[in-house]
């Protein structure tokens, strides 16, 4: 099976981020952000990101509408605003996007991209990466300092108990509990539908 990368753009300068991708031979960036725009790092707005990648010789593919961590369908959320990954995984559009990714991974070195530098609690790892690894693919994470980190190392770090706390009794979640680690609802609802 194929291997694939994940990489968060964080608040890097575009040149720094492109250097990280080039350092690891990434040929295609798959943008997995539901909303590929940012008021904090506008250099990573969808169109600007695509242009920068293409100028660097890296292809760009947007699949955030199908693989994003904030699905449009309210049926994929629990009452606390967490995304129900176990349901989303069974969505026909999600499945089609996974199949498209797998086809691309046979031909190119692919990186799944979103905004978070740390993949530990990001949907690109917890949702998309989990589905792909369950299908036999290997996930590697390009970190902000340039190092490549195995998913086992990320998982081990994510499950370390905080100082002075007890370790969790049940490290693995059953399918009914497989969901985002935090609410993805906005902290403050928009005033109207045209406000972002």
Give residue ranges: language-model regions.
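Residues lining hydrophobic/aromatic ligand-binding pockets adjacent to catalytic sites
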Residues: 1-196
């Amino acid at each position: 099976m194929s291997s694939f990368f994940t990489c968060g753009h964080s608040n890097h300068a575009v040149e720094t981020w492109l250097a990280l991708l080039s350092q690891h031979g990434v040929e295609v960036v798959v943008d997995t952000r539901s909303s590929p725009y940012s008021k904090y790092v506008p250099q990573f707005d969808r169109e600007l990101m695509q242009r920068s990648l293409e100028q660097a010789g890296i292809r760009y593919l947007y699949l955030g509408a199908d693989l994003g961590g904030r699905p449009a369908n309210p049926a994929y959320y629990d009452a606390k605003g967490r995304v129900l990954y176990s349901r989303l995984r069974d969505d026909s559009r999600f499945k089609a996007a996974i199949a498209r990714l797998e086809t691309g991974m046979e031909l190119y070195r692919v990186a799944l991209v979103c905004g978070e530098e740390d993949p530990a609690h990001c949907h690109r790892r917890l949702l998309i990466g989990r589905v792909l690894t369950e299908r036999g693919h290997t996930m590697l994470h390009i970190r902000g300092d340039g190092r490549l980190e195995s998913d086992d190392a990320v998982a081990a770090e994510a499950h370390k108990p905080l100082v002075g706390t007890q370790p969790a009794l049940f490290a693995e979640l059953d399918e009914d509990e497989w969901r985002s680690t935090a609410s993805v609802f906005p902290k403050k609802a928009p005033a109207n539908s045209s406000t972002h």
